[in-house]
Amino acid sequence: MKNLLTNPQPSQSDYINAIVKLGSRVYEAAQVTPLQKMGKLSERLHNNIWIKREDRQPVNSFKLRGAYAMISSLSAEQKAAGVIAASAGNHAQGVALSAKQLGLKALIVMPQNTPSIKVDAVRGFGGEVLLHGANFDEAKAKAIELSKEKNMTFIPPFDHPLVIAGQGTLAMEMLQQVADLDYVFVQVGGGGLAAGVAILLKQFMPEIKIIGVESKDSACLKAALDKGEPTDLTHIGLFADGVAVKRIGDETFRLCQQYLDDMVLVDSDEVCAAMKDLFENVRAVAEPSGALGLAGLKKYVKQNHIEGKNMAAILSGANLNFHTLRYVSERCEIGENREALLAVTMPEQPGSFLKFAYVLGNRAVTEFSYRYADDKRACVFVGVRTTNEQEKADIIADLTKNGFDVEDMSDDDIAKTHVRYLMGGRAANDNERLYTFEFPEQKGALLKFLETLQNRWNISLFHYRAHGADYGNILAGFQIEQREQAEFEQGLAQLNYVFEDVTKSKSYRYFLR
């Protein structure tokens, strides 16, 4: 493995040799995981589909492979000094268990707002935890600082040849489990898993197609491919937190650019639908990033009309907060085009509801919200069960033909996350501005929010609903005069929360203003 560490750009053969040599070593901590057939989904999509069950690892994710590969390769002197890492997720647990298995000290620096369930998990695997900083970048900076002070080895989450090679042992298993795969779909966060899997499979199966899958709101590889080099994202979504990476690694980008055949981006609703498929097919409960590869597989098959092929995706992890499942159950039907969310305007007069019901006929209504607004028209928020995109189009056409104004809200995130729970009627606030905030799930966060803004501006609307993630999503309305807009946004900047002005949202216009 000497070439892997001394060559600034290790070759494919350098990586293959390292993966083969690490194969026996990694299994001192990790396990060979099954490649399981998804029968129902295979029938539905007319392809043979397998799922690689990395949720069966001792830390419930693939991250153990790369962490153990690197830590076990350290010199005796490095091992004696211990290892350090920065993470609020699966990498932290992989490093902690690897160090415990090898009898080493492990210090994990985690952001101060890390949920206690994740802190306890790291401690349960034998790691010492230091809570520091408001976000991952601050925690990482502290970890690197301490690694120099204490002479401990910093274990990166993805951008290191040994970590990449460790993840590649997963692909070695896949070769032995199904010999004739046509496609493999791999989730991309920092790129370590995708790079390790692609470089090995392309060596032994040159014709195989390796497809990278990213979340639309944290697509750091796509941004790097577009620019030609790794670049920082200005904002990342946090639902699939296991792949919520601001910047892809330099080495992982080099390998992904060379060995991936294509990319597909998926949204959170499509991820939720894939999580449901995993449960229904193999009774696995995946974390959102764990289901990302399968979500990409489903989308790619439909977009490219592929049939009769052998395909695999990786269930990369299952470390999720149980309360996340409530959000998943609400959103998975939209991700499969099995539910349409519509805003319907009708005359405010007797018989309108009955006519509306006649047009819908025997279709299953999943949600129906209405409140009186004025004497002329009524706006109704309705969910209707559908079987596909065409049926939704047919419903909209039927309603329009019968004199109803219809807006499709199925892709309106404000409607799906907030407005469907806020059917209290309109407010005559001409100077109201509407904002969304990513809100940390930690003690004192709401107090900080109110102390910064409440004394100066009146809050006219507020909606928050927890769904088990490290960050929640808040919708808030403020009464702001036009001349105060700049001053108000300066106040928002002091919060250090991600925010967006959504005053022009069509769901806000329909139901709340």
Swiss-Prot record:
GO terms for biological process: isoleucine biosynthetic process; threonine metabolic process. It comes from the Bacteria. It catalyses: L-threonine = 2-oxobutanoate + NH4(+). Pyridoxal 5'-phosphate binds at residues 90, 189-193, 316. The keyword Lyase applies. InterPro entries: ACT-like_dom_sf, Ser/Thr_Dehydratase, Ser/Thr_deHydtase_PyrdxlP-BS, TD_ACT-like, TD_ACT-like_sf, Thr_deHydtase_biosynth, TrpB-like_PALP, TrpB-like_PALP_sf. Its EC number is 4.3.1.19. Catalyzes the anaerobic formation of alpha-ketobutyrate and ammonia from threonine in a two-step reaction. The first step involved a dehydration of threonine and a production of enamine intermediates (aminocrotonate), which tautomerizes to its imine form (iminobutyrate). Both intermediates are unstable and short-lived. The second step is the nonenzymatic hydrolysis of the enamine/imine intermediates to form 2-ketobutyrate and free ammonia. In the low water environment of the cell, the second step is accelerated by RidA. Homotetramer. PANTHER family: THREONINE DEHYDRATASE, MITOCHONDRIAL (PTHR48078:SF11), THREONINE DEHYDRATASE, MITOCHONDRIAL-RELATED (PTHR48078). This is L-threonine dehydratase biosynthetic IlvA. It comes from Haemophilus influenzae (strain ATCC 51907 / DSM 11121 / KW20 / Rd). The gene is ilvA.
